[in-house]
Amino acid sequence: MTLTLAVYGKGGIGKSTTSCNISTALAKRGKKVLQIGCDPKHDSTFTLTGFLIPTIIDTLQEKDFHYEDIWPEDVIYKGYAGVDCVEAGGPPAGAGCGGYVVGETVKLLKELNAFDEYDVILFDVLGDVVCGGFAAPLNYADYCLIVTDNGFDALFAAKRIAASVREKARTHSLRLAGLIGNRTSKRDLIDKYIEAVPMPVLEILPLIEDIRVSRVKGKTLFEMAESDPSLNYVCDYYLNIADQILSQPEGVVPKDAQDRDLFSLLSDFYLNPTQPASQTKELDLMMV
């Protein structure tokens, strides 16, 4: 049975880099993986393939939208570690609906029976946009994963994504697998957030520059580690995420949280920071 994942998060948070490394980790665990990029920039799979692959929407336009004239090899490209890659693409900037293209991508892949060929399908979805079109992958997903950092904006975006998961979970067995903290030196705000909106934290990746560099190089951390074994410890973070997903965790249906309440909670963290206990003790001694 195919396990389907949908990766969301604030724009620029590192979803595509995270997705590519999770896909690779799943492949390293012996799974046949398909990663579907759902972003008009069509750069989701760049880290796996090393180049911008042709998009499904471009291929459909070339064939005048005759689905019967398209073969799997026309739209599916082989990436690192044997991960198969698809890019949905999108309309020209400022014209059309990118969410519609996501729907057409799913329709074509179903026509090609591609969904039945894989152990794991991973949707890497544009930013924190959760309109009907870009929320479509949630209709097929078993689990949603939210990429964040220890910052206000990313966690507030996570709240909106969690609300979409809750809505979609009304009609099928979608669950939120948890948060992935990407390139963050702290997790105190993440911990404050999950106190208000309980959900698992799958992994917290430290502030490692090689994660950012891997994106520029068009390589996964696993591929970089082949020539630089010192990076193997970074790969272990992604393998840990893969192992948790493959264990098919229970996950959660996120509880409801009002925007204003969560906004106040997160902003209060910055406006009224609590002093470390050691510092408070020092101040008390000074006052005596």
UniProtKB/Swiss-Prot annotation:
EC numbers: 1.3.7.7
Show the disulfide pairing.
none
Q: State the InterPro entries in the record.
A: NifH/chlL_CS, NifH/frxC, P-loop_NTPase, Protochlorophyllide_ATP-bd
**Enzyme's top EC category:** oxidoreductase
Catalyzed chemical reaction(s): chlorophyllide a + oxidized 2[4Fe-4S]-[ferredoxin] + 2 ADP + 2 phosphate = protochlorophyllide a + reduced 2[4Fe-4S]-[ferredoxin] + 2 ATP + 2 H2O
Task: Locate the residues binding ATP.
Answer: 12-17, 41, 182-183
UniProt GO molecular function: 4 iron, 4 sulfur cluster binding; ATP binding; metal ion binding; oxidoreductase activity, acting on iron-sulfur proteins as donors; oxidoreductase activity, acting on the CH-CH group of donors, iron-sulfur protein as acceptor
Keyword presence, Mitochondrion: no
- Binding site residues for [4Fe-4S] cluster: 97, 131
Q: Which residues form a coiled coil?
A: none
One Pfam family here: Fer4_NifH
Q: GO annotations under biological process?
A: light-independent chlorophyll biosynthetic process; photosynthesis, dark reaction
Q: Does the keyword 4Fe-4S apply?
A: yes
Keywords of the record: 4Fe-4S, ATP-binding, Chlorophyll biosynthesis, Iron, Iron-sulfur, Magnesium, Metal-binding, Nucleotide-binding, Oxidoreductase, Photosynthesis
Cofactor binding remark: Binds 1 [4Fe-4S] cluster per dimer.
Give the superkingdom in one word.
Bacteria
Q: Which cofactor does it need?
A: [4Fe-4S] cluster
This protein's pathway reads:
Porphyrin-containing compound metabolism; chlorophyll biosynthesis (light-independent)
List the CDD domains hit by this protein, alphabetically: Bchl-like
Query: What does this gene product do?
Result: Component of the dark-operative protochlorophyllide reductase (DPOR) that uses Mg-ATP and reduced ferredoxin to reduce ring D of protochlorophyllide (Pchlide) to form chlorophyllide a (Chlide). This reaction is light-independent. The L component serves as a unique electron donor to the NB-component of the complex, and binds Mg-ATP.
Outline the subunit composition: Homodimer. Protochlorophyllide reductase is composed of three subunits; ChlL, ChlN and ChlB.
Q: Which NCBIfam families does the record associate with it?
A: DPOR_bchL
Stated name of the protein: Light-independent protochlorophyllide reductase iron-sulfur ATP-binding protein
Q: Which organism is it from?
A: Synechocystis sp. (strain ATCC 27184 / PCC 6803 / Kazusa)
Lineage, uppermost ranks: Bacteria, Bacillati, Cyanobacteriota, Cyanophyceae, Synechococcales
Q: Which gene encodes it?
A: chlL
